[in-house]
From Swiss-Prot:
Keyword hit for Phosphoprotein: yes
Similarity-based family: Belongs to the DNA polymerase delta/II small subunit family.
Superkingdom classification of source: Eukaryota
Name by which UniProt lists this protein: DNA polymerase delta subunit 2
UniProtKB keywords: Acetylation, DNA damage, DNA excision, DNA repair, DNA replication, Nucleus, Phosphoprotein
Modified residues (Phosphoserine): S257
Subcellular localization, as worded in the UniProt entry: Nucleus
Function noted in UniProt: Accessory component of both the DNA polymerase delta complex and the DNA polymerase zeta complex. As a component of the trimeric and tetrameric DNA polymerase delta complexes (Pol-delta3 and Pol-delta4, respectively), plays a role in high fidelity genome replication, including in lagging strand synthesis, and repair. Pol-delta3 and Pol-delta4 are characterized by the absence or the presence of POLD4. They exhibit differences in catalytic activity. Most notably, Pol-delta3 shows higher proofreading activity than Pol-delta4.
Name of encoding gene: Pold2
InterPro entries in UniProt: DNA_pol_a/d/e_bsu, DNA_pol_D_N, DNA_pol_delta/II_ssu, PolD2_C
Amino acid sequence: MFSEQAAQRAHTLLAPPSASNATFARVPVATYTNSSQPFRLGERSFNRQYAHIYATRLIQMRPFLVSRAQQHWGSRVEVKKLCELQPGEQCCVVGTLFKAMSLQPSILREISEEHNLVPQPPRSKYIHPDDELVLEDELQRIKLKGTIDVSKLVTGTVLAVLGSAKDDGRFQVEDHCFADLAPQKPVPPLDTDRFVLLVSGLGLGGGGGESLLGTQLLVDVVTGQLGDEGEQCSAAHVSRVILAGNLLSHNTQSRDSINKAKYLTKKTQAASVEAVKMLDEILLQLSASVPVDVMPGEFDPTNYTLPQQPLHPCMFPLATAYSTLQLVTNPYQATIDGVRFLGTSGQNVSDIFRYSSMEDHLEILEWTLRVRHISPTAPDTLGCYPFYKTDPFIFPECPHVYFCGNTPSFGSKIIRGPEDQVVLLVAVPDFSSTQTACLVNLRSLACQPISFAGFGAEQEDLEGLGLGP
């Protein structure tokens, strides 16, 4: 793929200089459409309750679940509301899950004077064998028992369950199903290889020299400043770069200055200022050569709740001179040469990881596709805007490439849906710790990691042998 193209011209590296230098034109993007408008906030009113988003989520998802239930269990299955249940009568119920978790952090429990509890330390997982599932619809709620994986499911998931109500007031689940993958448009054929580079977690301002070296190597490769003619020819096939959040390091979050009185910090400079200047210079180099989409992340200077709004252009006075720089939302969706991309900076996957037994980030990505919702745990354990007319996190259309950023390691796989949908799942690793980015081939939907690691591992080996400084 990418490396094979570079190998075809590798012999030119040690060749004598020629009178004329080879030039490689950047592969143009035939069509591009930014489809992230549903994630743009027209108003910012936080006076509403979050019950509205759960209600509209259930209203939007119910037709998909009823249709899928009838396909799964037959058209004769009876779909009822919770208020219509009769003990012992088998039926199907569609509702929203609530997961009662004993280990889930609660600020009300921690500040309660009568409990006087010490705040529990952060955990990697908050699941417990005693967790229970409760199904809610518009009018009632009922506890679930039976053949359903309590540890895997999370609050906010809309699903259909088949079973019957029992005399003890619980619903005995015999089977359950999700809405599954949304409809998908076919990918138009491409005659040449074109690549989209996915990068996340640059972590600028963290103070790591190894990370800065890898970042500059990344920029030099993409802009054609590094390598022989073969590598430069391959770099010309990168039609777009997507930066998936956490452009700044978590070290730039100066909690100490936030907690201090303003008169004590009046003459101090925020730690993120230099990091933003550095980011502006990097974006300047990239956008001068290739279109760049910049998504915000957890540690970046924008709103914390999902959907995160684009970074303000005033922070990038150098890079915004180029029209190729595009500041976008998180989540972000776009169609590039007929291939529909949808991705996040990773907060939704990390939150599901904490409140579910699922361990693999690719498994969580696939699961969110199956339940047809980007972030079911929002707004329960992940902050989001209190929408009330529509839930923008529901998949209206199945993407061809679905990615999440800032994962511990790289991973990719292709899954298929019941209606011949084909989706490439990509876990984009945190660049500051792995020095790895991802290349997606738009023609074949193949994905490969590309590493920009310097001499960190070699230096550690030398020190282990007693040869290092």
